[in-house]
């Protein structure tokens, strides 16, 4: 059975019945209803019953810590400024992103990986498209190959989430169960390995956050939080309050982004959220973002005629919030390399 249970007001949706070919239609519909309601009301939910092995999740944190344990010179070897054109991948040091005037830059540091696109691809170097950057000190089979395997698992998971979300749209809209499939054609799928260092009490500042109040820019976000950590909060307008999002064992946090909100005419809500600083604990997480097909002209499914080009929207939001790094997205895209 699909379940929608209240966990500090953030629902938990178990999708195991939807993935089970032997489940009844009623059980599958329960999952659809639960996820649709969670995304309509909260824009966030905890995901259980996803079928991804526990060892895969533990390995993701191992890879996260492997990268951030590198010396600074090794991390800077793959600085995001060294990515080709506007492909926007690699290492972001702390203090890069500022979401609102009057706040200090986020303390997070990030290693970002996207869909692997070869140098001779005609789109190479355009926004969010190109080869990934890998630190030379980490063996390919121990780091790169395992990261790309995890990315593949996330892509399969988001396909299932989109299938459920499509069936949860209002029936009167007449949408096909495959209405979101066009998002998956050569998708932009940035994946961020995140580290938040502790902020000692003597350095605390009310303007400082791990990540300040923001919404995600794309369609669907899948966040893996490390057990034993805290800090993620979601803004809930009816009570004008911030709701903590607890870590559930072997689960994910799923949220809708701005692009999904625009695509569904506001039916699926992109909720504001933030990450607080911690005085003592390091926080590690892994976030997978489905931006979608960057060239897709996404016309609002509610018939409101609003149309958004996926890549233009997300690129614009990054330029607005990423400071000097955002200027990388205004570089001229290089001509594709012709390989022998």
Curated annotation (Swiss-Prot):
The residues covered by the Fe2OG dioxygenase domain are: 187-292
Annotated pathway: Secondary metabolite biosynthesis; terpenoid biosynthesis
| Keyword Nucleus on entry | no
Sorted UniProt keywords: Dioxygenase, Iron, Metal-binding, Oxidoreductase
Coiled-coil ranges from the UniProt annotation: none
Binding annotation for 2-oxoglutarate: 283
GO MF entries? dioxygenase activity; metal ion binding
Q: How is the cofactor bound?
A: Binds 1 Fe(2+) ion per subunit.
- Residue positions annotated to bind Fe cation are 214, 216, 273
Q: What induces it?
A: Expression is significantly up-regulated under xenovulene A producing condition.
Q: What EC numbers are recorded for this enzyme?
A: 1.14.-.-
Documented applications: Xenovulene A is a natural product exhibiting little structural resemblance with classical benzodiazepines yet is able to displace high-affinity ligand binding to the benzodiazepine site of the gamma-aminobutyrate A (GABAA) receptor and could be potentially used as an anti-depressant with reduced addictive properties.
InterPro entries xrefs: DIOX_N, IPNS-like_FE2OG_OXY, IPNS-like_sf, Iron_ascorbate_oxido_reductase, Oxoglu/Fe-dep_dioxygenase_dom
| Pfam families xref list | 2OG-FeII_Oxy, DIOX_N
Q: Name one GO biological process term.
A: terpenoid biosynthetic process
- Going by the record, the broad EC class of this enzyme is oxidoreductase
Instruction: Please name the Gene3D superfamilies in this protein's record.
Output: B-lactam Antibiotic, Isopenicillin N Synthase, Chain
Cofactor(s) demanded: Fe(2+)
Hey, which family's this protein in?
A: Belongs to the iron/ascorbate-dependent oxidoreductase family.
What functional role does this protein have?
Answer: 2-oxoglutarate-dependent dioxygenase; part of the gene cluster that mediates the biosynthesis of xenovulene A, an unusual meroterpenoid that has potent inhibitory effects on the human gamma-aminobutyrate A (GABAA) benzodiazepine receptor. The first step of xenovulene A biosynthesis is the biosynthesis of 3-methylorcinaldehyde performed by the non-reducing polyketide synthase aspks1. The salicylate hydroxylase asL1 then catalyzes the oxidative dearomatization of 3-methylorcinaldehyde to yield a dearomatized hydroxycyclohexadione.
* Protein name stated in the entry: 2-oxoglutarate-dependent dioxygenase asL3
* Native species: Sarocladium schorii (Acremonium strictum (strain IMI 501407))
């Amino acid at each position: 059975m699909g379940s929608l249970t209240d966990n500090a007001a953030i629902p938990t949706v178990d999708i195991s019945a939807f993935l089970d070919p032997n489940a009844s239609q009623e059980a599958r519909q329960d999952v659809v209803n639960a996820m649709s309601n969670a995304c309509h009301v909260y824009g966030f939910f905890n995901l259980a019953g996803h079928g991804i092995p526990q060892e895969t999740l533990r390995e993701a944190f191992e890879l996260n810590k492997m990268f951030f344990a590198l010396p600074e010179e090794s991390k800077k070897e793959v600085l995001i400024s060294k990515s080709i054109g506007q492909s926007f991948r690699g290492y972001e040091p702390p203090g890069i992103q500022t979401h609102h005037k009057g706040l200090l830059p986020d303390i997070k540091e990030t290693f970002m990986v996207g869909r692997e696109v070869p140098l001779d691809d005609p789109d190479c170097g355009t926004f969010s498209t190109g080869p990934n950057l890998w630190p030379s000190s980490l063996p390919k089979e121990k780091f790169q190959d395992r990261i790309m395997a995890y990315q593949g698992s996330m892509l399969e998971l988001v396909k299932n989430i989109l299938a459920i979300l499509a069936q949860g749209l209002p029936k009167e809209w007449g949408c096909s169960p495959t209405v979101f499939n066009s998002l998956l054609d050569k998708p932009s799928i940035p994946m961020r390995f995140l580290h938040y260092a502790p902020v000692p009490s003597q350095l605390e500042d009310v303007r400082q956050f791990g990540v300040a109040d923001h919404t995600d820019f794309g369609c669907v976000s899948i966040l893996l939080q490390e057990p034993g950590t805290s800090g993620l909060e979601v803004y809930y307008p009816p009570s004008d309050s911030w709701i903590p999002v607890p870590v559930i064992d072997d689960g994910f946090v799923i949220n809708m982004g701005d692009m999904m909100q625009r695509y569904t005419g506001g039916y699926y809500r992109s909720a504001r959220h933030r990450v607080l600083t911690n005085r003592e604990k390091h926080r590690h997480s892994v976030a997978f973002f489905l931006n979608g097909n960057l060239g897709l002209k996404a016309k609002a499914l509610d018939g409101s005629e609003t149309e958004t080009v996926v890549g233009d929207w997300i690129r614009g939001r990054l330029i607005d919030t990423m400071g000097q790094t955002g200027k990388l997205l205004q570089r001229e895209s290089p001509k594709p390399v012709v390989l022998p």
